[in-house]
């Protein structure tokens, strides 16, 4: 928990801000689910005044969750958005997500009104003319069997990638 000057800073920040977004660097690399530390810290951050938590570090896409803060607010948590652009070689590391969050402010306060996660994949294609690799982050919905066949990592079929994404993005 927060004590002393940390508590004063937090309270002052909350007074000055309409909405607090926290970007923790946390989690266990290559895990598809948040670990106990992430779950505990997410709740502590929510209770301390965070309105939205967007995590990173595990290099994998992890679930999205809604927490109830101590004051009753709903707090959206993206535990990890994975890699947007990467040269890691495992399928779980080639997947990521782009978060889209609509924040509204009205007479009742400021809150998340809508949110979604658009799954992405790193496609790595070899340029036949130069021999260089071309790295292309793209939406998973645009990933075709033709692109999968050209991908540097042949295990990344559309079916395998879609299954891995569904497994990684179960809601906590």
Which role does the model predict for each range below?
Residues 13-33:
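Short acidic, glycine-rich surface-loop motifs adjacent to enzyme active sites
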Residues 25-29, 59, 82-84, 120:
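Active-site beta-loop-alpha junctions enriched in small/polar residues
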Residues 5-6, 10-20, 40:
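Binuclear metal-dependent hydrolase catalytic cores centered on His/Asp/Glu-rich metal-binding motifs
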Residues 36-99:
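Conserved beta-sheet core of the metallophosphoesterase superfamily
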Residues 93-167:
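A short C-terminal boundary segment appended to hydrolase-like catalytic domains
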Residues 2-11, 164-171:
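Conserved small/polar residues in nucleotide/adenosyl-binding loops
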Residues 5, 27-33, 85-90:
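Acidic/histidine-rich helix-loop elements
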């Amino acid at each position: 928990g927060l004590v002393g000057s940390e508590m004063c800073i937090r309270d002052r920040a909350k007074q000055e801000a309409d909405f607090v977004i926290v970007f923790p660097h946390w989690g266990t690399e290559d895990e598809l689910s948040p670990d106990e530390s992430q779950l505990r810290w997410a709740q502590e951050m929510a209770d301390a005044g965070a309105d939205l938590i967007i995590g990173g570090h595990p290099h994998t896409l992890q679930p999205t969750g809604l927490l109830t803060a101590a004051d009753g607010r709903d707090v959206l948590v993206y535990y990890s958005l994975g890699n947007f652009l990467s040269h890691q070689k495992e399928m779980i590391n080639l997947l990521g997500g782009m978060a889209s969050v609509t924040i509204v402010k009205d007479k009742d306060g400021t809150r998340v009104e809508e949110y979604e996660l658009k799954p992405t994949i790193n496609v790595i294609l070899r340029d036949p003319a130069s021999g260089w690799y071309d790295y292309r982050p793209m939406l998973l919905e645009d990933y075709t069997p033709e692109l999968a066949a050209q991908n540097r990592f042949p295990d990344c079929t559309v079916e395998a990638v879609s299954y891995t994404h569904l497994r990684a993005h179960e809601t906590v």
